[in-house]
């Protein structure tokens, strides 16, 4: 069973890595003593088109093209990339590193520590309709999450909502700008017309960052919140 899963995984990765492939047929496959031998294979190819490639797979694979290196204000290097399932433990540690004040500003209240199911939803996402960018940096031999920005798009991808939080001891390093610019650029590439977010009036750092990036800032006195809206495209 394990070797069959490994075979299917390799075929799937081949299809992901080679956008020219339109079909794969392996027939017959000889199975003996836990080993699989492909006796004949037929692979269909077509001319590669970048835009068409976005829709060729039912489930969008990990968008490795969005991974890039960034330099923080303290002149250290970090990696900006989409979140992935393997980040669950690092994401738990990231959440635990937030001060009560920063956590309150992010979630608009006091929440208990996230459990496995909640963390799974945060790290196992559908890249076609949502995105979570993290800035990750090696510290003491392991990858640590310094900040995260999330974008959730409507089904028609005309509007999107964002949220962002930076580790309490890493604020002032330019992480907010890096994460917000990544979220905005991703929305533009997806054809989103408007990106919006809500924060608390006391979250002055977020408000100033949004204003600097061109968001329209309005206050909802009835809800006691600040609305941030940016028109795109």
Labelled PLM ranges:
Residues 1-23:
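A long amphipathic alpha-helix within ATP-dependent nucleotide-binding catalytic cores
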Residues 8-12, 24-26, 65, 118-119:
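Glycine-rich, charged/polar anion/phosphate-binding loops
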Residues 11-14, 30, 180:
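A broad "ordered helical/assembly scaffold" signature
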Residues 20-43, 162:
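Conserved metal-phosphate-binding beta-hairpin within the catalytic cores
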Residues 46-233:
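Long, contiguous binding/interaction regions
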